[in-house]
Amino acid sequence: MMTLLSNGTSTDTGPDTSSDTVVPSYVLDSWWTPDTDVVAQRVLDASTGAEVARVSSDGLDLAAVVEHARTVGQASLGELTFHQRAILLKKLGQYLGGVKEELYALSARTGATRYDSMVDIDGGIGVLFTLSSKARREMPNSQVYIDGDVEALSRDGSFSGQHIYTRIPGVACQINAFNFPVWGMLEKLAPAFIAGVPTIVKPATPTGYLTEAVVRHILASGILPLGALQLISGSARDLIDHLDYRDLVAFTGSAGTARTLKSHPNVVEGGVRFTSETDSLNAAILGPDAAAGTAEFDAYVASVVTEMTSKAGQKCTSIRRLIVPAGRRDQVVAAVSERMARRVTLGDPRAEGVTMGPLASTGQRDEVLASVARLIDGGGRIVMGSVDAPTGTDPGGAFVAPILLAFHDPESPAVHEIEAFGPVASIIEYTDLDHAIVLAARGGGSLVTTVATHHPDIARTLVLGIAAHHGRVLMLDRVDARSSTGHGSPVPHLVHGGPGRAGGSEELGGIRSVLHHMQRTAIQGSPDMLTAITGEWHAGAAVRTGIHPFRKSLAELRVGDQTQGGPRVVTLADITAFAEATGDKFYAHTDPEAAAANPFFPGIVAHGYLLVSWAAGLFVDAAPGPVLANSGLEKLRFVTPVSPGDSIRVTLTAKRITPRETEEYGEVCWDAVLHNQNDEVVATYDVLTLVAKE
């Protein structure tokens, strides 16, 4: 039996949150509360039922809120580059890390254990750091993001095309679920902020007071520009009425609510961008090789218990369907039950020793129990746990014990259609891998599925079979069981979302999430026009010669600054010496007969790396100066072979200049082109250097 702890009188209930006043909204760069006589919705402590706060937005002018974001927010964010915004996010993450203990105490009132709070609070802060870092590494220090290579549209190079991303000119409105009041806000705020789009946050009412506390700290930090962030505490029913094609709505919640919002005329006809991440019947497939006693079986059971109890099962990524080989059901049920009894203590998360708290509200508890009843009516049988109120817990709390149901018929519609959004999962059996794939797909589109197997062929078959039905698939075996971030934990580097029932959208995914808040546009024109618009030099655009560009500091250097070097004649002795010095004696460089038989070479040819090395000697200015180091080489392509007697020359042009906001130097990307004596292109590549700002 699981240990059940009640809320003792000596338990710390965290900081005082007076419910005498309504949780405020933050709009138009000031705090706002409704009139004192407003009828506000009561929000209760998830463990005790005591009133924590009251919430209302009656009287709030949402049209003015949207207009403030489009004007003040757009203007202030538009003054910054991607890197400058990313630096502010990093500072914000550092600031919030210093106040998280206060947030932990408040989070406990939502029913979250300390581990749950870490996932929510630290996880949200982690998104700020990750996206800040990736933006500074993968995006230019400008306001235009280039997508892909230039497309030549004329024979003479005078007309070309390029795809670019620029920020949408409106507002990013996030409508969030109750389960992650911190992470849910920050994981949407971060990419919008880097893109340069102001955000309006509408948290879920049951836990919105925690979101408000985070926003209050964000504002106290003084880090964000004016208009960058607004908060609506309470209803925002007519918010979409004030949006159009310039704006984006990012919704997290139920599929039913998502359908209602998607059907709004401003979405259907007005072009409001709408993304949704909704409920999902995620699965965990136990491979046929993962028998009881294997590391994969143990890891599978541990993952199931974690996902059923973390946040009391109130995660859109929680495991809802256990899909196991025929004949393994009883073994899995026994193992899950044993681990649950040994590891899980249900109670008030402020009490010592508690590992699983209540649901977020009694209303949510009632919905979960109603869903369990529907699962039973659909053919499920409870094989672990009970729908009875757990003994020893506060009757005013929203407690539900973990429940595992078994379905004799794996094709039962209920198990693939009904989600009990709490500590509830169902187990079904499959006959073979094809059957497992079919069952996983019956979820109608899911956020994530785990595949527990150590057999590469089984993993490949299952993943290729289910990938198109999922946003993420986690491979679990003995190698990564300890290092895995877990089935239920989206990471900011990878996409979070899924097709079909899961919402049909994406969040996170590194820089992909930033681009969701931007418009991709194809621009066409001459090289000079493309260079002026993108800030990156395009071949054929104007160049400047004279002073060697290596003698210019970052402040003096401009895209289009160019130097040329050469020619230098290649001899057979040079090729032979390079082969001896490097050990690269590939026959094309050393055996005349074999080289001549190669369809790509006329005979002995120079090593490509010999030519690149010579090119550096031809374009470099060797004396000490602003250029501090060569940091790399990218996009190297060898085009025309070079034979003994040929000559090469190099043209080096400043292509892209990226100042580093926190350093006294920046990165310069140089366009390098090698030609032979016939003006044929021998090689093309980008040279990366670090250059002092002054």
Where are each of the predicted segments found?
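Short, well-ordered beta-strand elements within core beta-sheets of diverse protein domains
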Residues: 39, 51-58, 74-78, 153, ...
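Catalytic strand-loop segment that frames the active site of acyl-thioester-processing enzymes
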Residues: 546-606, 691-693
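Conserved C-terminal structural/oligomerization subdomain of aldehyde/semialdehyde dehydrogenase
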Residues: 48-54, 87, 223-226, 245-248, ...
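ALDH superfamily catalytic-core signature
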Residues: 217-222, 247-248, 256-410, 432-434, ...
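Rossmann-like NAD(P) dinucleotide-binding subdomain of oxidoreductase/dehydrogenase enzymes
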Residues: 139-299, 430, 505
